[in-house]
Amino acid sequence: MHITNLGLHQVSFQSGDSYKGAEETGKHKGVSVISYQRVKNGERNKGIEALNRLYLQNQTSLTGKSLLFARDKAEVFCEAIKLAGGDTSKIKAMMERLDTYKLGEVNKRHINELNKVISEEIRAQLGIKNKKELQTKIKQIFTDYLNNKNWGPVNKNISHHGKNYSFQLTPASHMKIGNKNIFVKEYNGKGICCASTRERDHIANMWLSKVVDDEGKEIFSGIRHGVISAYGLKKNSSERAVAARNKAEELVSAALYSRPELLSQALSGKTVDLKIVSTSLLTPTSLTGGEESMLKDQVSALKGLNSKRGGPTKLLIRNSDGLLKEVSVNLKVVTFNFGVNELALKMGLGWRNVDKLNDESICSLLGDNFLKNGVIGGWAAEAIEKNPPCKNDVIYLANQIKEIVNNKLQKNDNGEPYKLSQRVTLLAYTIGAVPCWNCKSGKDRTGMQDAEIKREIIRKHETGQFSQLNSKLSSEEKRLFSTILMNSGNMEIQEMNTGVPGNKVMKKLPLSSLELSYSERIGDPKIWNMVKGYSSFV
């Protein structure tokens, strides 16, 4: 299933918002209907033209989205029923009937009818007795389908101010030395989607995310992933703790992989130094689907891998021959958590459980007294001593972090939901640590952090300076951000995890005062809707 570009040729704009230079192919009251196939380059700013072309390529009605998604899922469930020796004729007949309709003739009733037929046939053909068992089976079928697809690298490119940037995303299944996956348990080219809540060996949805400039130089690198918790297993059970440990070891292996020179040294028998800054984006309260216990699993597992004074941490890594080799790592991990959703930023939930954790980690990163007197210590001071050219950037980011934390600005949106998580991640990379970030699934909040980092790192690369705190995005910066959101690789990752692209961070709530500031940060409602994509259907 691949339906990122839906191929619909007509898109409606409100009057006054049409694409200048396009030829109108029809008239409706208050609306210009424009044919994508006949769009010509107009005289408007090229950045706006590019965004409008993206809109025309991707945008479709919600009914159309839900129809395509429901129909493609129906194909998956038909295959599962066939493999079990069942009869798919009723589902096929319903699909054939829908195929005779034009898109405008289909409504939610038709889609609900298809979904109902699918549920009834799965229940009847597979001998399922109750609703809970049915829901579990439907989820299992679709999760198995997603996990048996090949997950390949995603490479995207954008141009800005005449410079080209490459976004390189490497899934865990392609973290290889030669042709061999580095991890203890093989991926065999497949993925672990975010619905794999009982997975014991692998982290769900783990990727190495790089930004490379037009000279081929890496300007940012980090690991993005789903939560280090097999939260589908019984809470506080030994098997859940073991699963978290396995996932944590895999994250450290991936972090080592992201530093090829360190990995090579480690495989040659040397003990290497590795620092990791883990930034979680969960909201740890009882109201958020168990994110409090998930965070405990993750923090406990990562801290448990920190090297003790008695010796380095031992890991098993596959070498180029595919053989497991024990490597020694002087490992230091600091763990943060900053809630970035509406519950955290609009209702103030989840902070009580992480303030102490964050304060301790800031002491490790910037020194015990930094928040009080501004004197940089900790890992940051060590980095400045080893690499003096990073000093100005470290001081700039550190002072912003100090202002945010001392004024508790991270606990409110204020036009920048990811203000602290982004700066901690950028500081980690600047001082030579491996930044890692995650939410529950590794696709929505994690994807937005990924996009915010890419926007800021391009700004820094072009201007030589990070953004000021509390500064609003200019019109040009909004266009850059929009372009990144559409071309960062996030949509492809979302599709691998759910079957369709779309970010759940984009929400319209009954009370607009509870909404995050992404309508303002993006600026263009068309792009906002494209980024939202199919997320309301998964």
Swiss-Prot record:
GO molecular function list: phosphatidylinositol-4,5-bisphosphate 4-phosphatase activity
Outcome, altering residue 200 to S: In plasmid pCP301
Impact noted for substituting residue 300 to N: In plasmid pCP301
Residue interval(s) of motif CX5R motif: 439-445
Effect of residue 166 to G: In plasmid pCP301 and plasmid pINV_F6_M1382
Entry GO terms, CC: extracellular region
Effect seen on changing residue 144 to N: In plasmid pINV_F6_M1382
This protein's record includes keyword Hydrolase: yes
Subcellular location: Secreted
Induction description: By growth at 37 degrees Celsius.
UniProt xrefs under InterPro entries: IpgD/SopB
Annotated EC: 3.1.3.78
Coiled-coil intervals, chain numbering: none
Effect on the protein upon substituting residue 311 to E: In plasmid pCP301 and plasmid pINV_F6_M1382
Active-site annotation: 439
EC class name: hydrolase
Catalysed conversion reaction: a 1,2-diacyl-sn-glycero-3-phospho-(1D-myo-inositol-4,5-bisphosphate) + H2O = a 1,2-diacyl-sn-glycero-3-phospho-(1D-myo-inositol-5-phosphate) + phosphate
Hydrolase in keyword set: yes
Outcome reported for the amino acid change (mutating residue 325 to Q): In plasmid pINV_F6_M1382
Consequence of substituting residue 424 to M: In plasmid pCP301
Main location: secreted
Similarity-based family: Belongs to the phosphatase IpgD/SopB family.
Its biological purpose: Converts phosphatidylinositol 4,5-bisphosphate (PtdIns 4,5-P2) to PtdIns 5-P. IpgD is injected by Shigella into the host cell and is required for invasion. The accumulation of PtdIns 5-P causes membrane ruffling and actin cytoskeleton rearrangements at the entry site. Acts in concert with IpaA to coordinate and control the membrane and cytoskeletal rearrangements induced early after invasion of the host cell.
Protein name (record): Inositol phosphate phosphatase IpgD
